[in-house]
Amino acid sequence: MKNLFGYEIIQTLGQGKTGTAYLVEKNNSQFVLKKMNEQTEDPQKTLEIFNGEKYCYERMSRIGSGIPKLFEFDEKNHFLVKEYIQGETAATLATRGAFCKDGLTENHFRQILDMSGRFKKVGIHVDYFPTNFIYTNSGELYCIDYECYDYNSEWDFEHWGIYYWLNKDGMRAHLEKGGTSKLNKPGTFKPFDKPFEELKKRVMELV
């Protein structure tokens, strides 16, 4: 296995807009190592983005639970190591449908509503796209992406994220082929909403 900063790489978990995440192992324990994308034309920008992840981790951790622990933060080499959360993403569950046994259940929705409420209480919202959330085998919910913003209702779970969680066919297309053409209204970062309003009402009644 390839070694990266003293960790053995098991597999690549994914590549995002700010970096690449790897499942790694050290001393018989597994972690997630995220190596930041290097902004070669603007090294200062790389550092700002990297430090932003730590800042978001600190803000998000104020809700008390549901955030992977940060174990290592290397400013020189621009990588961080955090707790590895095993389970299924909300995106995978969403492809099986809402309010069904093998998809997103009532309990799953209660948990994300509770978490989004806790984020709101500390004055932030996160990226509620369902790939950023994992339900563990023991039933716990984690937000695995260190990304947050000052609270804005336009981008919270109720007014933005929920529509991605309810768009079964769109999420399946996204996971299989990439792209957001079946998730977002053309030319926007806003999700299709009208087809899912009745389901949304059912979810929000759980609050």
Regions found by a protein language model. Give the residues of each.
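ATP-binding glycine-rich loop module of kinase domains
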Residues: 11-12, 17-51
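Hydrophobic residue at the +6 position relative to the catalytic HRD Asp in the kinase catalytic loop
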Residues: 128-134
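Structural motif at the C-terminus of the N-lobe alphaC helix and the adjacent alphaC-beta4 loop
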Residues: 55-66
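C-lobe/activation-segment region of protein kinase-like
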Residues: 124, 136-207
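Conserved N-terminal boundary motif of the eukaryotic protein kinase catalytic domain
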Residues: 3-12
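Conserved structural core of kinase catalytic domains
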Residues: 65-108
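Conserved hydrophobic "DFG−1" position in protein kinase catalytic cores
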Residues: 23, 35, 72, 81-84, ...
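Protein kinase catalytic-loop region centered on the HRD/HxD motif
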Residues: 114-124
